[in-house]
UniProtKB/Swiss-Prot annotation:
Role description: Plays a role in a RAD51/RAD54-dependent homologous recombination repair (HRR) pathway to repair MMS-induced lesions during S-phase. Required for error-free repair of spontaneous and induced DNA lesions to protect the genome from mutation.
Coiled coil: none
Subcellular location(s) of the protein: Nucleus
Protein family per UniProt: Belongs to the SHU2 family.
Gene Ontology biological process terms, A to Z: DNA recombination; DNA repair
Domain of life the protein comes from: Eukaryota
UniProt KW keywords: DNA damage, DNA recombination, DNA repair, Nucleus
Gene Ontology CC annotation, any one: nucleus
Protein name: Suppressor of hydroxyurea sensitivity protein 2
Gene name as annotated: SHU2
Record keyword Nucleus present: yes
Principal location listed in the UniProt entry: nucleus
Ranges for region Disordered: 68-95
TM annotation in the entry: none
Length: 249
């Protein structure tokens, strides 16, 4: 790839927030035309749906104030969160609340700076009561939804040549000046690798990429200010395993 002509999607998506920390409607209108098949509109609708969950397994026992007695069922989380939202707020933040805010900020920064060091799962609860949750693996650009798998079969598995790897990925030469993290994959040696998101994408992948592959301020905005995305830490190993069991079933 010639990096001089590479579009830095992370930088463009980071402009979703203006200097005042509010959604930039001009940027929203521009990004609508940047992605095909109304993917951007559908991704933003997902972010606003209260159905997106980022579960993090927190090994640090000193962070108990942030994670004590957290349920792993999406319905449980929504009920608890709605109760907190409708409860009257105290006039002054307590020390525990301030501590939780600091811990949450540190976690968000870690998800950006060292995502590989944090064990986490990305899940979207579907509207239908009988529909299984959608699981997203952002680091490998995979989604369990039907739309992703249909596109993958149509665009990746129809021809034997070239190889699946060469069709699905692109590499930037070592030393390239691009800082884009959108659709980035684990590096291969000194080269930076990206999944060909222009070939395969779905609203779930784009939505989580907006949250986790742009800027920490965007994740903070949607998990705290807008409060439409759930960032949940789990310390109890049994609860973490229960989460995986619920997803598999």
């Amino acid at each position: 790839m010639v990096d001089e002509h590479y579009i830095d999607y992370s930088q463009l998506l980071a402009q979703l927030l203006d200097k005042d920390g509010e959604l930039n409607e001009t940027t929203v209108s521009f990004l609508y035309h940047l992605f095909p098949s109304d993917f951007f509109v559908r991704a933003m609708s997902l972010i606003d749906s209260n159905n997106m969950f980022i579960y993090v397994f927190e090994r640090d026992e000193t962070s108990a104030a942030l994670t004590t007695s957290v349920g792993t069922e999406p319905d449980e989380v929504e009920t608890t969160t709605e109760t907190l939202r409708t409860s009257p707020s105290p006039p002054v933040a307590s020390e525990q609340e301030l501590g939780n805010a600091v811990q949450s900020s540190a976690l968000i920064n870690t998800l950006y700076e060292k995502p590989q060091s944090v064990l986490h799962r990305l899940i979207v609860k579907q509207e239908g009561p009988q529909s299984p949750p959608v699981c997203v693996d952002l680091r490998h650009w995979f989604c369990s939804c039907d739309e992703y798998n249909t596109l993958f079969e149509e665009r990746m598995l129809t021809d034997e040549e070239p190889s699946l790897y060469s069709k699905a990925t692109t590499e930037l030469r070592a030393g390239a000046s691009i800082t884009d993290s959108f659709a980035s994959m684990p590096p291969k040696g000194a080269s930076r690798r990206y999944f060909r998101h222009d070939i395969i994408m779905c609203p779930h992948l784009l939505a989580f990429a907006i949250l986790l592959q742009t800027t920490p301020e965007l994740l903070t905005y949607f998990t705290h200010k807008a409060a439409t995305v759930y960032l949940i830490t789990i310390q109890n190993l049994d609860e973490w395993l229960k989460l995986h069991l619920n997803v598999v079933i």
